[in-house]
Amino acid sequence: MTTPTPLMPRERVPALDLPLVGGDRYVLGAKPAQRFDLLVFYRGVHCPVCTKYLLELERLAPEFEKRGVRSVAISSDESERAVKMAEKVKANLVSIAFDLQLSAARAWGLYLSAGRGEEPAYFNEPGVFLVKPDGTLYYGSTQTMPFARPPIADLLGAVDYAITKDYPARGEYAGEA
């Protein structure tokens, strides 16, 4: 059994190169946002909690954009399911990436679940990350289930604080405890 390993702030994050709904690709670091890429890993179109979360992300995406933050929602869904999610949340400013391999999800420290009922056989659980233009982790949060994610409005407030106070990434100490 492989246990997820958390990513460390101020260290490089794993590579991402994924197709986007609409035909382009999201390649982390190829065209970095001015301040952060906000990566929201979600469970898939089968998840109503994910839909609600992405609706809120889309609603606040213009505010993130004003602050130099690009919003990308990522799942292991295949193309058809990703298009359905994009339609459900009326994705405009939020890019919807898909075909995340489970090995890549694990590299990002995400938890994996076995499907039940109409869910995919296996899929990633949620995670939210802010990645700096240099490819290092600024903030990360992972969940074992769809509930209790960081509210999108709180993330926006955190971005504001980070910008105005020039606040460094925290949680970076990996020495002896």
Please identify what each model-predicted range represents.
Residues M1-A177:
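Chalcogenol-based redox active-site neighborhoods
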